Amino acid sequence: MNIAVFASGTGTTLQALIDQQTTYGYKVTLLVANRECPAIERAKQANIPTLQSKDWTEIDNALTGHHIQLIVLAGYLAIIPEWICTKWEKRIINIHPSLLPKHGGKGMYGMHVHEAVWKAGEKETGCTVHYVSAEIDSGSIIAQSVVEVKESDTPNTIAQRVQAAEKVLLPRVIGEMV
């Protein structure tokens, strides 16, 4: 299965997907970034074609040209237009750093999520892989992984454990979709 990874940051989740593609039977065929970011260099080091663009027609054409079967949002900090969500329905997935529906929606990404979990005094958090729809973080849930929140935790320590769980859950889910 050919997948395109969309990323906006360091690309550590992209790297996990690259490292586990043989194990799970998918191929990272394209990286799409909406801005200059370290994920682009990671993709280039793995000989994966990259596209840095905010032009959704250009992005859609690249997806078609690379015979993409699944789009994986991995730290992609941009809203997907409704027409892309419709055209690629049930073929776009996202990894979110909480147990949705808790701590999801507009503005809930990265450390904002972990700070909200910590401030709420949650006993557990985790990550969710879900289908992408036009409404932020509201697509059908595919899988979740639970992470305990310890009394001694800070938002940073919560983030570290959730990110580690993401790097296990996301490749596995993609492998199950192959």
Please give the residue ranges for each predicted region:
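One-carbon transfer enzymes
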Residues: 1-178
